[in-house]
């Protein structure tokens, strides 16, 4: 019982400490993650944080390939730009080549109603400004009832569960982390559309350290470099 109460207390303390703005990441300029499938490195995910006065652009690049016996079975490449002005979301755009299938999403803010305007390959329309782009670097995602696919604009309603405190070892470094599970709140979704991902954030900095999920294999994102 004491452990349960402690876990709940830690979770709410985490929520209270979440900065309402992305200024929390003002000391981060670059994040790079190693992407693994079944414990084999297959690619990377890189973020660059570019600042100009009160403007922040977060540029992302993801690339991976799956091969067997020297034959390429699957390839994926995506680029995106996430823009903030004075700490608030302003605009997002991405293009993705998913095994030779093109996907995209553009998101802006309605200047009057402040809703998010989504133009994507899977969804077009307005949605709540309480939703967040599904880019895991921003720890505010743990507070949100839904995330917007950074690939296609699909609205993914989610449940977030605090799993507990864990030590995560990557290479020679050990991180003290808070582990969360993200799952789809819509039970009617097909298996390939359901969200079920574990995310680890560093306890004191809220930096994204690791992600893991099962989908035709065991996938992991592991922090490789931060500067």
Regions of interest found by a model, annotated:
Residues 7-15:
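Bacterial N-terminal signal peptides
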Residues 1-4:
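Positively charged n-region of N-terminal signal peptides that target proteins for export
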Residues 15, 126-127, 190:
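Alpha-helical interaction segments
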Residues 21-110, 139-227:
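Acidic, serine/threonine-rich low-complexity disordered tracts
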Residues 6-7, 206:
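General alpha-helical segment detector with a strong preference for membrane-spanning helices
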Residues 94-134:
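Hydrophobic, well-structured mid-protein blocks that either form specific transmembrane helices
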